[in-house]
A protein has these predicted regions:
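Generic N-terminal targeting/processing segments that precede catalytic cores or assembly contacts
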Residues: 1-114
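A glycine- and small-aliphatic-rich helix-loop capping segment at beta-alpha/alpha-beta transitions
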Residues: 49-50, 118-123, 174-179
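Gly-rich Lys/Arg/Thr-decorated short loops/hinges at beta-loop-alpha junctions or inter-strand turns
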Residues: 69-73, 119-133
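Short gly/ser-rich anion-binding loops that grip negatively charged ligand groups
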Residues: 75-83, 128-131, 135-138
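Short, conserved acidic/polar surface loops in the N-terminal third of protein domains
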Residues: 112-117, 172
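Glycine-rich, mobile lid/loop segments that gate access to catalytic sites or pores
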Residues: 132-178
Length: 179
């Protein structure tokens, strides 16, 4: 691959050392997809054009990364104001850098038309009404993460994990506040 120009801000020497340490690394990208009913709260997410399309955002992102087009909907996911999914940039980056990737389904309401690791988890409930997952399901999810994390990280120098979960940022904030 040709050298890419990288701009750094802050501690330039530290940034150079870090980027140089990654130069010969083998990267793999993992997209974790899921769904939470929290995303259905009006105004909480911009991960889909409207409430009906939210459930298609994650599987469509996974399909777009794999195929270059979506199978579960007619176009890439868009925000209510017409902005395209961040998966557009992710795909371009993965393609340019020739980084292999895979998908983990951690509770998507709609299953993508791609091969994926399946956690067998249900999607999350609305956290403003109840717990998203039962304590047993949380333990199951953490254990699945540990097992698959150990397995997939071993053959890689650098595993990059991304997510496509409408309402996921709000849910993550609630979890962190709960800690």
């Amino acid at each position: 691959m040709d050298k890419l120009e990288i701009s750094s801000h802050g501690n330039i020497e530290s940034a150079k050392e870090f980027t140089n340490s990654l130069e010969k690394s083998q990267f793999t990208f993992c997209l974790v997809i899921s769904y939470t009913e929290t995303s259905e709260i009006p105004g909480i997410t911009i991960a889909g054009a409207d409430k009906e399309f939210l459930k298609f955002t994650s599987p469509a992102d996974a399909e777009f990364l794999r195929h270059g087009f979506c199978k579960c909907i007619d176009s890439i996911p868009m925000s209510p104001d017409g902005k395209p999914t961040p998966a557009l940039l992710t795909k371009a980056s993965l393609d340019i850098a020739k980084i292999p990737h895979f998908v983990i389904n951690a509770g998507s309401k709609i299953h993508p038309d791609v091969s994926y690791f399946d956690s067998q988890l249900d999607y999350g409930k609305n956290i403003s009404e109840s717990t998203a997952l039962t304590p047993e399901k949380v333990i199951e999810a953490v254990e699945f993460g540990r097992v698959i994390g150990k397995s997939i990280s071993k053959p890689n120098d650098c595993l990059v994990i991304g997510e496509s979960i409408p309402g996921g940022t709000t849910t993550a904030l609630a979890v962190l506040k709960g800690f």
